[in-house]
């Protein structure tokens, strides 16, 4: 489904007592992280992440390197059956990786040039949480693209494709930082 369709029992899934109503997905896709049954959730951080999922809010989690910020998001997503993709910004990721690029592909056994969408257009059109990892290490040209997406009603325009992708609210997608 394109929208969360299953009420989640926060006490059962996260061992958290709260009146917050959160929905996840009934079915699991290949993009849903595996559940670590030994994972222990921090209540305040978990509630912030859950609010991001439920109310289409961007969430930033800060802390020292290696303290499990991204893993925390992935474990929340796993229990919601919510697709989640981690994008490491300290690697060689480019604007083209995020937005898309022309590529040579085979169609009817012939090579043709075709625009292949990047991770951002794909994530806007599908219910997926993006985890921008190592945010402080992102290159300026990459961060400029991400900044537009992180705005409350973010807009992504693909000029080469004459396409404008808009967030709608409430949205089946969440961008989690």
PLM features: what roles do these ranges have?
Residues 1-169, 173:
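AAA+ P-loop NTPase catalytic core and its hallmark functional loops
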Residues 175-177:
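N-terminal low-complexity segments that are often proline-rich with Ser/Thr-Pro
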């Amino acid at each position: 489904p394109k929208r969360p369709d299953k009420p989640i029992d926060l006490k059962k899934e996260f061992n958290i007592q709260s009146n917050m109503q959160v929905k996840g997905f009934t079915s699991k896709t290949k993009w849903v992280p595996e559940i670590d049954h030994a994972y222990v959730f921090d209540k305040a951080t978990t509630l912030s992440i859950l609010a991001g999922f439920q109310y289409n809010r961007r969430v930033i989690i800060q802390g020292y390197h290696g303290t499990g910020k991204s893993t925390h998001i992935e474990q929340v997503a796993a229990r919601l059956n919510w697709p989640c993709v981690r994008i490491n910004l300290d690697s060689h990721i480019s604007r083209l990786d995020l937005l898309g690029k022309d590529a040579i592909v085979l169609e009817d056994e012939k090579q043709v040039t075709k625009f292949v969408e990047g991770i951002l257009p794909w994530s806007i059109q599908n219910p997926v949480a993006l985890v921008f990892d190592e945010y402080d290490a992102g290159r300026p040209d990459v961060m400029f693209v991400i900044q537009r997406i992180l705005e409350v009603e973010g807009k992504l325009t693909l000029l080469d494709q004459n396409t404008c992708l808009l967030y709608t609210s409430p949205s089946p997608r969440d961008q989690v930082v």
